[in-house]
Structures are given as C-alpha cells and as structure tokens.
Amino acid sequence: MVDLVKRFLQLEAASGIILFFTAVLALILANSPWSEIYFSFLDIPVQFRVGSLDVHKPLLLWINDGLMAIFFLLVGMEIKREALEGSLSSMRQAGLPVIAAIGGMIVPAAMFSFIINDAPQFMAGWAIPMATDIAFALGVLSLLSGRVPLSLKVFLLALAIIDDLGAIMVIALFYTAELHTIPLLFAVALSAMLLMLNRSRVMLLTPYLIVGALLWLAVLKSGVHATIAGVILGFAIPHIRGATHTPLRQLEHQLHPWSSYFILPFFAFANAGLSFSGLSWTDLGSGLPLAIIVGLFIGKPLGVMLVSWLAVKAKLAALPENVGWQQLFGLSVLCGIGFTMSIFIGGLAFGTASEAFASSRLGILFGSLIAAVFGYILLRNATRTCQRKEQKRVSSQL
C-alpha cells in the first residue's frame, strides 16, 4: 500500500510540473500574435451524431464536459479506494484530513461571499476558492524532494480527495442547469443498472464502461453537469479490500497516466489562456479577482489551520506522524492552489464565454501563484527548522 501511495505521489508531482508549463504556454499564446489561432482552435465545432441523438459543441466544451468526466471517473475510484483501504478507511486516519478539508471549503467560500456581497452578479462564483489542485500542490511539494515526511504528502492527498468530493457535491447541487425529465430518468435507470452490476459481482470492466458511456450522454442531456456521470461510474467499479488485482485497480492504473499527462494538462491549456488585453494591475485589487485571491490565499489556509488546531486541542484528531504545526501551516497555504478545479468551477458558474469567467481566471491564476510561492517558502523554512531541531536532539544524546 505504501508503494502504491509513493507511485501515485510521484505521478501527481510530475503532472503538476507539466500543468505549470501548459498553463504558461496557454497564457503566452493568448497574449501573442498567434492568439487568434489559439482561440479559433478551442472554438472548432465537434459533432457526435447517432440517429436522432445529436451532440454538437465547440472543442472547449468537449474538453470540459467529456475529458473532465474521465478525470472525475478517476476521482470517484480514488475516493472509493481510499475509503475502503487507504487514508480515509478509518476515523483515526481520516479524522484530521476530513475536518481540515471541511474548514478549507467553508472559510474561503464565506470570505468570497463577504467581499463580493455588493456585486450579486458575481455571487455564483462562491465555490471557486474552495478547490485544491492536487497535481499542482504535489508538484510544488516535490521541489522539496525527500525533506518533507511522507505522512505530510499523504495528508495533502487525503485532504484533496475530500476537497474533490465536496466539489462534486457542490457541482451536483448548485451548478445544475434546467433539468430535463426524460434524460434524467434514463440517467437514474442507468445508475441503478451500474449498482446492479456491482451487487451482482460482475468483474468485467466492459459492461460498466458501456453503461457509463450511455450514462454520460443521459446526464449531459438532463441538465446535470456531465462530469457527475464519471463520479457515479467510479463509485460503481468493483473493488475488494486487500486484493491486488481488481477492476478498480486495473482501470485506475490504466487511466492515471492519461489523466496526469494528457487530460489535466490539455484542460489547463484550453482554460488558462487568459488575454490580458484591456486588463490592468488595479483589476486584481477589486471585485471578483480580489475575492478569489483572498479566498484562496487567506481563506483556504485559515480554514484548514483553524479547524485543525481546534480538532487537535479537543483531542478529536492528531497531527500526522513527524509533522509539526509549522509544516502543516505551509501545507495549508499550498492548499490555496486552486488552478484547474477552480477554473472548472468558474466555467460552470459564469459560462466559459463570459467576461466574469475571464475576470475569475485572473484571480485564480494570481491567487494560485501566490499560494504556491508562499507555501513553498513556508514549507522549506519549516523543514529546515525541523532538521536543525533533530540535529540538536541527536547531538545532545551523544
């Protein structure tokens, strides 16, 4: 299990570095003489048609609705596996990450709502600063190489998984468009079929994937965001605790490199391309961008640290092994890297073609960048302090 976690962390860390470069490339293209080619590429119409069924969207929406459904399929499987046998499988292990994640969702959302209170047209973006980009956060953490204890990385992984679960619930409950009854009934029936396959202990992946593809179409047409289909399918894929070869492990192993090295970087490339034309530095200090920056950089670490401190003092949870408060504070700042998940929620809140979405991306990019830089500095200083204390302790015993 430890080797599995280490491989996962290495893959996510590498993905975070690739994400950074694809986001920078998108920003360069969006503000270069090739900007028209970049935006035209994202606007290419793509059509899927079978009989009377017709799905016609620009490439950008296929990325956000289609490729991200595969990403959320992986998220669903990760949540299920961690709940059965990983870092969320017992209250002792899951206690602090769950509590910290809840605080890290409530406080930034509350701060955003307070700042944006005078601009109700932007209130739909309240969930934007709730998210943590696990790939980016682990990418920054990897820059500290072996100086950070594994328990701190596992804590970040568990917290981010709970964050993802919270994001899934928010998307399902608050970012659903007008519902269409017949496709929704089909989606319910197909979800029930997946449950029956699981209960019948069907161990072949093919039936799940066929029903899952139909479920994606039904959910897409129902008005509920299509990524929810990926989560439902992920929960349905069978897994046996302690078994080394299960359908869930097989599919997770196959999808993880695609998600880390293609889906998330491609999503970042498609959505991070913000044109700075007409924008000024003063825009960062007002309205929507400011609310997002404050939510990510101040609200996120404040929420994580405050509830963690209260939980530990009340003896409801304990700090991870070999982790001190300084390290946890640095990690909590790192949790403010919202990036891909925040951009995704921003697109749902405002629509990808709106000025509000462009403004939200400005706040997300700068808020995530500030969180990454300060989180890295704080963690580096905290690990140096811990190393000096350990050296003094060892030398005093000699």
Curated annotation (Swiss-Prot):
Tell me the first and last residues of the signal peptide: none
Catalysed reaction, written as an equation: Na(+)(in) + 2 H(+)(out) = Na(+)(out) + 2 H(+)(in)
Where does the chain cross the membrane? 8-28, 59-79, 96-116, 124-144, 154-174, 177-197, 202-222, 223-243, 261-281, 292-312, 328-348, 362-382
Pfam families found in the cross-reference section: Na_H_antiport_1
Q: Does the keyword Ribonucleoprotein apply?
A: no
Please report the record's description of how this protein sits within the membrane.
Answer: Multi-pass membrane protein
Q: What is this protein called?
A: Na(+)/H(+) antiporter NhaA
Give the species this sequence originates from: Tolumonas auensis (strain DSM 9187 / NBRC 110442 / TA 4)
